[in-house]
């Protein structure tokens, strides 16, 4: 009992000493400012030296004023005029258009994957029952001859600047033409559905 009481007094006494010590710290005295300023001065000095050394390094690593162009050297050896080729610029334009189309596929695949993944994860049981029931109902109605389902007659309602969503969704998920859409849709769908329920 006395040991616990002494430890408690020691802890409280040390807390009170700490309060008094930090309450009246005279930072304007030369000795105290000198003691507290040494680590700060050292770190500022090292930081400044690092910045100066980095500046000198970057100054020396600047690109030179000369242009090192291999095609220019080849043209000088040919002694012919430098004329741009039309076929090359057409190929570059076509490559750029394909790259933009690829980026659109990746974006749309990721967007639809995240939206459908979160939706399926949040209402998965309800979605499953409604989906199965509607599928069975459509099959029963088609079997009776009351409805006819033809995927070729489905028109795309939403068109985003040269992107046919019907073609992208149906051919993209079932065919091999839009691999960027399929890969990013699948990855986004799986990640969103796994993380939505956590």
Swiss-Prot record:
GO BP: autophagy of mitochondrion; mitochondrion organization; phospholipid homeostasis
Transmembrane segments: 39-59, 112-132, 172-192
A Pfam family recorded for this sequence: FUN14
Keywords: Membrane, Transmembrane, Transmembrane helix
Domain of life: Eukaryota
InterPro entries: FUN14
Membrane association type: Multi-pass membrane protein
UniProt-annotated location(s): Membrane
GO CC term, one of those recorded: mitochondrion
General remark: Present with 1920 molecules/cell in log phase SD medium.
Membership in a protein family: Belongs to the FUN14 family.
Protein name in the entry: Protein FUN14
Provenance organism: Saccharomyces cerevisiae (strain ATCC 204508 / S288c) (Baker's yeast)
């Amino acid at each position: 009992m006395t040991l616990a009481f002494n430890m408690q007094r020691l802890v409280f006494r040390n807390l009170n000493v700490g309060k008094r010590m930090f309450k009246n710290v005279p930072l304007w005295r030369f000795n105290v400012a000198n003691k507290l300023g040494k680590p700060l001065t050292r770190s500022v000095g090292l930081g400044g030296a690092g910045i100066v050394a980095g500046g000198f390094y970057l100054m020396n690593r600047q690109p030179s004023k000369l242009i090192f162009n291999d095609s220019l050297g080849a043209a000088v050896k040919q002694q012919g005029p430098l004329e741009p080729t039309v076929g090359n610029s057409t190929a570059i334009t076509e490559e750029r258009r394909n790259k933009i189309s690829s980026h659109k596929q990746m974006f749309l695949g990721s967007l639809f994957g995240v939206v459908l993944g979160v939706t399926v994860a949040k209402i998965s049981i309800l979605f499953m029952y409604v989906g199965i029931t509607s599928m069975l109902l459509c099959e029963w109605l088609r079997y009776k001859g009351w409805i006819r389902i033809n995927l070729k007659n489905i028109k795309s309602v939403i068109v985003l600047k040269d992107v046919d969503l019907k073609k992208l969704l149906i051919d993209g998920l079932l065919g091999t033409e839009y691999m960027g859409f399929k890969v990013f849709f699948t990855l986004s769908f799986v990640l969103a559905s796994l993380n939505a329920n956590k």
